[in-house]
Amino acid sequence: MVLKLFSFCLLLLLPLYAKEYTFATYPSNTPSKIIQALTPLMEYLSAQSGDTFKLVVTKDYDELTKRIEEKSVDFAWVNTKNFVLLKEKIPSLHYLVTYLEHSKSRQITPYYQAFIVTMKDANITSLEEAKNKHFAFTDKESTSGYAYPMMIFEAHHINPYTFFQKVFFLKKHDKVIEALMSHSIEIGAISDGTYYNALETYGDRFTILATSEPIPLDAIVASANISHQESQRIAHILETIPLDAPSNKAFEEHLGWASAGFVKKDEHFYDSFKRTLKVPLYETVQ
């Protein structure tokens, strides 16, 4: 009887200590798809932690960075570039986990790649043949839609801003595919996941002209106003998400991501990205 009364009292006290957290992410796809994909993850975090996690999809990468800097969000899903630059600017930023995916060989991996692609009917078989064509990046803050493609161009001694007739920034990876399909552009930079989704949707109509080196997948971070202990508690919850969890299925269903959960790496896992910052064209060409 005493034990039951004690347990009941604990249940009554839980709401007093439960916290409400804001979890932000960037618009890599249409916001409605991102909300559908991440809502089960928010529900999982809320159920496992006893706290409430509310999802925010920012307008763009810049807004996400700004909100992390001003601590108006508690947790955030950030891309590789965001993480490296934010960590340099805010050393107290807490790294939690790295996103995992099933590769095309069905192995679980913390990496992905950037592709530069064209349509087969464009009859372009190499980057050099794409001179004076219309090209699209996604966003200057994108890892696979800008940073790593710029490394590819540097390796080929190509300045995209003078090599192509016109360069566009279409913000989202699926918008690059749409522009290719409508022949508004002849060549574009996208993530490998976007390419494989397009392959399933439109068939074998694309040619990969160049492939980047492996890129560390996105990270989840906690802002500086979250304690180290709390960060580790949430990281553990993320690490232990089952493979068959609704959150993983939602990523597959709404974004086409072959999600495999999360893993805790050393934050220096992302140091390889720093080489992209040394590409001359990367920061100097506007």
Protein language model features and the residues they cover:
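Periplasmic-binding protein-like
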Residues: 22-27, 97-113, 201-242, 255-268, ...
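Acidic, polar ligand-binding/catalytic clefts
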Residues: 66-129
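Extracytoplasmic small-molecule ligand-binding "clamshell" domains
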Residues: 19-89
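A ligand-binding cleft/hinge motif common to bilobed small-molecule-binding domains
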Residues: 77-91, 154-155, 179-206
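Ligand-binding clefts/hinges and TM-proximal coupling segments of bilobed small-molecule sensing domains
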Residues: 52, 129-152, 236-286
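Bilobed "Venus flytrap"/periplasmic-binding protein-like clamshell domains
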Residues: 19-46, 58, 109-176
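Hydrophobic h-region of N-terminal signal peptides that target proteins for export
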Residues: 10-18
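Short helix-initiation/N-cap motifs at beta->coil->alpha
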Residues: 55-66, 79-81, 101-102, 160-178, ...
